[in-house]
Amino acid sequence: MLFKNATIYTMEQDPFVGDFKIDKGVFTEIGKDLTANEGEDVQDLNGLYVFPGLVESHCHLGMEETAIRFEGNDVNEITDPITPNMRGIDGCNPMDETVELALKGGVTTVAAGPGSANVLGGTFFAYKTKGNCIDEMSIQNPIAMKAAFGENPKRCYQGKKIDTRMQISALLRETLAKTKEYILKKESGKDVDYDQKLEAMIPVIKKELPLKCHAHRADDILTVIRIAKEYDIEVTLDHATDARCIVEQIKESGYPCICGPSFGHKTKFELKSKSFKTPGVLNKAGILVSITTDSPVIPEQYLSLCAALAAKEGMDEYEAIKAITINPAKILKLDNRVGSIKAGKDADFIICTKNILDTQNEIQSVYIDGKKAV
């Protein structure tokens, strides 16, 4: 199929008015004055805008269902602060209406998983937002291991297993050390009892899976960096609310930041520095940054609004769009498939009446894998 005369934001080059082709679920050609093959369908998008499908790098979409209480809340397993053996895919209901609303908002790929009650909460996975079977929608499982620092684990286990930040770090270090020992015993051929929790942590130690680290306060962000360097593991700095005051340390670490959710009330002390200025400051410093809704904290369909507010607060407009397309794809290591319009990549794209950051924009169509989903 050939689409012509659109203003195309490929996120691989400057926007231009041109054409693109899709076939068998992928982009095949992007350029100007493309000609249709015999019998090929052609759509004229004159006056319209095309963007890659939006990518959400941190959420709980489908795990905390809408208009329901505990029955549909499968975000946190608050029975033990160390639960790396939990799998986000087992708690995700893709038929909840929030998934469809995200799709209508142009969000085509999300990374979803457990919340931040536990020091180690379980695995995140990535899925496309069209379908009714999560196994068929999933494109990478697992994609990260959730970890959490600061107020949330302290609050959830206060007076029981955690009272201080020291204990949070100690529990994480203990699990990492036990996993390294577990690996050594297995690889040396020694008899070792199967341990589901340590098995889940093996990809983290082998740097096959990053720790997805919930950290708002500056000292917690620096603790993440400290432990990551100690154990030579990959991490992402999720939320990164205080990141503006430790920009140089974050830049030196080389770890990416997932900023947000920045819309709404500052409901706890950790959020006192919450601001839409943060993504722009980090981006200008050369740090790879994406913007998150942390849905359902902010409904997923407002991901583009969050990017617009970041642009309003000083982030370059094009960089703000990158922060909800190619940047999260890079952070999730899915940029070989999604996040930009490029030959060979999944044909996930949205057709808009205006720039995606314009609050008056209307999304006319959403395509996933070359098929019209909205």
Segments (PLM) and residue ranges:
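Metal-coordinating catalytic core of metallo-dependent amide/deamination hydrolases
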Residues: A126-R226, E230, K268, P296
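Divalent metal-dependent hydrolysis catalytic cores, especially in the metallo-beta-lactamase
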Residues: P81-R87, M95-K130, S138-N152, E208-L211, ...
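Histidine-rich, glycine-flanked metal-binding segment
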Residues: I8-G53
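His/Asp/Glu-enriched, well-ordered alpha-helical/loop segment
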Residues: T66-A67, N73-E77, T83, P210, ...
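Active-site gating loops and adjacent loop-to-helix segments of metal-dependent hydrolytic enzymes
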Residues: E65-C92, C133, A147-P153, P203-I205, ...
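Active-site core of metal-dependent hydrolases
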Residues: G88, I183-S275, S290, K330-L332, ...
